[in-house]
Amino acid sequence: MGSRGRRGGGERETETEEDETWKLRVGDDFTVPERFHRKPPFFSRIFPAGSHGKHRKIAKYYKKQENLLKDFSEMETMNEIGSLDQNAPTEEELRQMAKGERLAINLSNIINLILFIGKVLASVESLSMAVIASTLDSLLDLLSGFILWFTAHAMKKPNKYSYPIGKRRMQPVGIIVFASVMGTLGFQVLIESGRQLITNEHQVFDHRKELWMIGSMSSVAVVKFFLMLYCRSFKNEIVRAYAQDHFFDVITNSVGLVSALLAVRYKWWMDPVGAILIAVYTITTWARTVVENVGTLIGRSAPAEYLTKLTYLIWNHHEEIRHIDTVRAYTFGTHYFVEVDIVLPGDMPLSHAHDIGESLQEKLEQLPEVERAFVHVDFEFTHRPEHKAEV
């Protein structure tokens, strides 16, 4: 990736600007031209063509460069103060955050149970296929709550002998299991609703129970909406999965209620049609969730911009680094594993080389996206690949 000549040996007591000429530096005077901050007309954003399309591409390029320089600035701060953020949360603040996350999860599970009981009663009273589809969705909320609680609980009990690299992979696996069950349920509702439409089979609804159904389903939608807002205030992936689940419930409850009311007031077939809409929405949404989480488990590479950011950090880590042979970052769960090969002088004492490699590893693992970093130290870079070739 790059190399540099020898830049003076010996220990450095203090560093001046002249001593740091080996470092990569980015300027602070780069700004996106003002004309690219302005949004093009609405029609041009929908159908980019001609000069507007070119303007959009150039603005995107400048924005990308601006973000890259911002990343470089963060890496410089990390090299200077030893951490990414001087305002990083303390241990007490982290404990408070964890306490808040547990409260959000427990509150979601308790409310899901209460609302599920209410929706079961609404389903029994209305016999609406759309309401039943929404109720079955709430049943899976309870199942998802158990799966996500179990994965969160398991991740908090590490076992370095049985699970040497931790249990963080349990999080996407739990989400995949839940999403698969959600998709299966949606498919079953789709089949039953289609059967009702084909056979012209439907239930006669009692108008006296209409207000009770409206109150029950509306209350569920309102409660779920506020739960969604609360859970979205957290950064924890499991809590945010709950937020996504609550958002789905707002949609399915609203569609189920509207479909049932339209079926009562106008045409009976609007009820199974609403159930089909809920089923299709459930299947497509959770299929997308499965694809996203499977992608985190199969070792997908980090974006080129992130690898560039890592390379900048590695190069500026220590003056004695002669060459960067390899920089890899790939998903193995929700975070990245990073592999780095650096070249140091061949006559450097082992203890000194070890300290440089270990401090670089610790620095890389401070990045919030990185779960584990592996730093390999070598004295030359002309050798053949050291790992078994891919078949």
UniProtKB/Swiss-Prot annotation:
<keyword id="KW-0812">Transmembrane</keyword>
<feature type="transmembrane region" description="Helical">
    <location>
        <begin position="247"/>
        <end position="264"/>
    </location>
</feature>
<dbReference type="InterPro" id="IPR050291">
    <property type="entry name" value="CDF_Transporter"/>
</dbReference>
<feature type="topological domain" description="Cytoplasmic">
    <location>
        <begin position="156"/>
        <end position="171"/>
    </location>
</feature>
<feature type="transmembrane region" description="Helical">
    <location>
        <begin position="172"/>
        <end position="192"/>
    </location>
</feature>
<keyword id="KW-0813">Transport</keyword>
<dbReference type="GO" id="GO:0008324">
    <property type="term" value="F:monoatomic cation transmembrane transporter activity"/>
</dbReference>
<keyword id="KW-0406">Ion transport</keyword>
<feature type="topological domain" description="Vacuolar">
    <location>
        <begin position="265"/>
        <end position="266"/>
    </location>
</feature>
<dbReference type="Pfam" id="PF01545">
    <property type="entry name" value="Cation_efflux"/>
</dbReference>
<comment type="similarity">
    <text>Belongs to the cation diffusion facilitator (CDF) transporter (TC 2.A.4) family. SLC30A subfamily.</text>
</comment>
<dbReference type="InterPro" id="IPR002524">
    <property type="entry name" value="Cation_efflux"/>
</dbReference>
<keyword id="KW-1133">Transmembrane helix</keyword>
<comment type="function">
    <text>Involved in sequestration of excess metal in the cytoplasm into vacuoles to maintain metal homeostasis.</text>
</comment>
<feature type="transmembrane region" description="Helical">
    <location>
        <begin position="135"/>
        <end position="155"/>
    </location>
</feature>
<feature type="transmembrane region" description="Helical">
    <location>
        <begin position="211"/>
        <end position="231"/>
    </location>
</feature>
<dbReference type="InterPro" id="IPR036837">
    <property type="entry name" value="Cation_efflux_CTD_sf"/>
</dbReference>
<feature type="transmembrane region" description="Helical">
    <location>
        <begin position="267"/>
        <end position="287"/>
    </location>
</feature>
<protein>
    <recommendedName>
        <fullName>Metal tolerance protein 7</fullName>
    </recommendedName>
</protein>
<keyword id="KW-0472">Membrane</keyword>
<feature type="topological domain" description="Cytoplasmic">
    <location>
        <begin position="1"/>
        <end position="103"/>
    </location>
</feature>
<feature type="topological domain" description="Cytoplasmic">
    <location>
        <begin position="288"/>
        <end position="391"/>
    </location>
</feature>
<dbReference type="Pfam" id="PF16916">
    <property type="entry name" value="ZT_dimer"/>
</dbReference>
<dbReference type="GO" id="GO:0005774">
    <property type="term" value="C:vacuolar membrane"/>
</dbReference>
<dbReference type="InterPro" id="IPR027469">
    <property type="entry name" value="Cation_efflux_TMD_sf"/>
</dbReference>
<keyword id="KW-0926">Vacuole</keyword>
<dbReference type="GO" id="GO:0016020">
    <property type="term" value="C:membrane"/>
</dbReference>
<feature type="topological domain" description="Vacuolar">
    <location>
        <begin position="193"/>
        <end position="210"/>
    </location>
</feature>
<dbReference type="InterPro" id="IPR027470">
    <property type="entry name" value="Cation_efflux_CTD"/>
</dbReference>
<feature type="region of interest" description="Disordered">
    <location>
        <begin position="1"/>
        <end position="21"/>
    </location>
</feature>
<feature type="transmembrane region" description="Helical">
    <location>
        <begin position="104"/>
        <end position="124"/>
    </location>
</feature>
<feature type="topological domain" description="Cytoplasmic">
    <location>
        <begin position="232"/>
        <end position="246"/>
    </location>
</feature>
<feature type="topological domain" description="Vacuolar">
    <location>
        <begin position="125"/>
        <end position="134"/>
    </location>
</feature>
